[in-house]
C-alpha cells in the first residue's frame, strides 16, 4: 500500500482511476447533509400536520355549535308557528265580534233614521251587550267641564210658541252633524280593523313567514355543504394523498440511491501482482498468479483491502523475496 498525496493507491473506481480520500469524505458529507435535510423536512411536515389537526378540531367544534344553533332555531320556529296559530284563533274571534258590532251599528242607524223622521232625537249608547238607558242631550257652556253635566230623563214637550221651533231645529241640526261625524269615525275604525284582520293580510303574513323559514333552512343547508366542501378541498390542497405517497416514495428512493452510491467491496478490491522479473534482453510479461496466503490460512480468490491490512499488521513487514507490489495502471 502506498499513498501519494491524498490519492490512495490500489483503490479505484469503476472507470479505473484512483479514488482520493477527500472525495470519499466529501461524498459522505453530502450524504449526511442530504439526510439532515430530509429529517428537517420531515419534522416540518409533522409540525404542519399537527397544525392542520388543530384547525380541523376547531372547525369541528364550530360545526357542533352551528348544529346546536340550528336546533335552537328549529325550536323557536315551532314556537312561532304555535303563536301564529293562536293569533289566527284570536283573529277569528275578533272577526265574529266585529260582525256583531256591525249588526248593532246597523240597528242604531235604523233607529236614528226613524227618530229623525219623527223629529225626535234620542241618543242610544251600547256598552258591550247591555244597552244603557237613553239620555236627553242638553246644551252646556263652553267653560263647563264633564262634572257639571246634568242628565235629565226623556221629556218631549210640544213648544208653546212658534218661535221656539226654530231653536229646536238648530239644536237638532247640530246634534245630527255630531252624530254623522261619530258615525263616520266609527265606520272608519271598523273598516281599518277589517282591513288589518282580513283573510288576505293574514294569508300574506303566513306566506311570508313560511318563505322566510324555507329561506333560512336553505341557507343553513347551503352553508353546511359549502363548509364540508371547503374542508375537503383544504385537506387535499395542503397534504393530498398523492403527495403523501410521493413523499414516502422519495424517502425510499433517497435511501436506495445512498445505498447504491456508497462504495462497495468490489470497488476496493486490490489487485495483487507479483514483481516483474526483468532480465536483460528479455521482455517479461505481467503475470497474475494467486497470492500465497500466510500459514494457517486458506487462499481466497478475492482479497479485500481490510484483509490485507490486517494480515500486514499481524505478520509484520513483508520480506523482499515474497513481497508484492500494487500494479499501477
Curated annotation (Swiss-Prot):
**Disordered as annotated region, ranges:** 198-260, 274-329
What is this protein's name? Caveolae-associated protein 4a
**From which residue to which does any coiled coil extend?**
198-262
Q: What does this protein do?
A: Induces rhoa activation and activates nppa transcription and myofibrillar organization through the rho/rock signaling pathway.
> Could you tell me which residues carry Phosphothreonine?
292
Protein family: Belongs to the CAVIN family.
Q: Where are the transmembrane segments?
A: none
UniProt main location, coarse: cytoplasm
Q: Which InterPro entries match?
A: Cavin_fam (IPR026752)
Q: Where is the composition biased (Low complexity)?
A: 279-290
| Subcellular location, record wording | Cytoplasm, Myofibril, Sarcomere; Cytoplasm; Membrane, Caveola
> What is a biological process (GO) this protein takes part in?
muscle organ development
Biased region (Polar residues) positions are 221-232
> Where does the record place Basic and acidic residues bias?
201-220, 242-260, 310-329
Q: What keywords is this UniProt entry annotated with?
A: Activator, Coiled coil, Cytoplasm, Developmental protein, Differentiation, Membrane, Myogenesis, Phosphoprotein, Transcription, Transcription regulation
Q: One GO CC annotation, please? A: plasma membrane
